[in-house]
Amino acid sequence: MVNWQVIGQLVSTGAIMLLGPAIIILLALKKGNL
């Protein structure tokens, strides 16, 4: 059996770790352009 809850937590954690810095960089670039 596959434990979807654990997989979901791992995927969400990985997504946050990847998207977090990307969002910060995008916000920094937008502020820099303004």
From Swiss-Prot:
It is a single-pass membrane protein. Its main location: plastid. GO terms for cellular component: chloroplast thylakoid membrane; photosystem II. GO terms for biological process: photosynthesis. It is found in: Plastid, Chloroplast thylakoid membrane. The chain crosses the membrane at residues 6-26. It comes from the Eukaryota. Keywords: Chloroplast, Membrane, Photosynthesis, Photosystem II, Plastid, Thylakoid, Transmembrane, Transmembrane helix. InterPro entries: PSII_Ycf12_core-subunit. It holds the Pfam family PSII_Ycf12. A core subunit of photosystem II (PSII), probably helps stabilize the reaction center. NCBIfam families: PRK13686.1. Belongs to the Psb30/Ycf12 family. PSII is composed of 1 copy each of membrane proteins PsbA, PsbB, PsbC, PsbD, PsbE, PsbF, PsbH, PsbI, PsbJ, PsbK, PsbL, PsbM, PsbT, PsbX, PsbY, PsbZ, Psb30/Ycf12, peripheral proteins of the oxygen-evolving complex and a large number of cofactors. It forms dimeric complexes. This is Photosystem II reaction center protein Psb30. It comes from Thalassiosira pseudonana.
